[in-house]
A protein has these predicted regions:
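Conserved catalytic SET/PR domain of SAM-dependent protein methyltransferases, capturing the structural core
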Residues: 1-127
Length: 127
């Protein structure tokens, strides 16, 4: 669940992106798991789903290897784009602002640390 006010808009990085509607201070919590807003799905359940659902999870969800689950949010966080110099850091359970973030700035993370399965480092986004 994104803990900051945000909107989904056109991104110069790729497709749509998540943009902050408020100033965010360096170190501020920006994302945390919420069982109300986020869904954690065991891979065994996903493998029973149609291919288009598997593709959606591979492209937009975070894979949690230690638990064998995928996490996908319902608040638009799945539109968050990759950056080699992200403004969010990730400790595996939470995301924090890596630096001060201005109103209107796109929120970005490093897909290689949040484990987006279809991330292509050569393209800089999931495909």
């Amino acid at each position: 669940m994104l803990t900051v006010d945000h909107n989904i808009s056109q991104s110069t990085i790729h497709g749509l992106g998540v943009f902050s509607n408020e100033k965010i201070a360096a170190g501020q919590l920006v994302w945390t798991f919420s069982p109300v807003v986020d869904r954690e799905v065991p891979i065994e359940q996903l493998l029973k789903m149609p291919d288009h659902v598997l593709r959606m999870f591979a492209r937009h969800a975070w894979y949690v290897k230690e638990r064998g689950t995928f996490v996908i949010g319902l608040d638009g966080d799945y539109f968050m784009n990759h950056s080699d110099e992200p403004n969010l850091t990730d400790d595996g359970e939470h995301m924090y602002a890596a630096r001060d973030i201005e109103v209107g700035e796109e929120l970005t993370c490093d897909y290689s640390t949040v484990t987006v399965v279809e991330f292509d480092p050569n393209k800089g986004h999931a495909h």
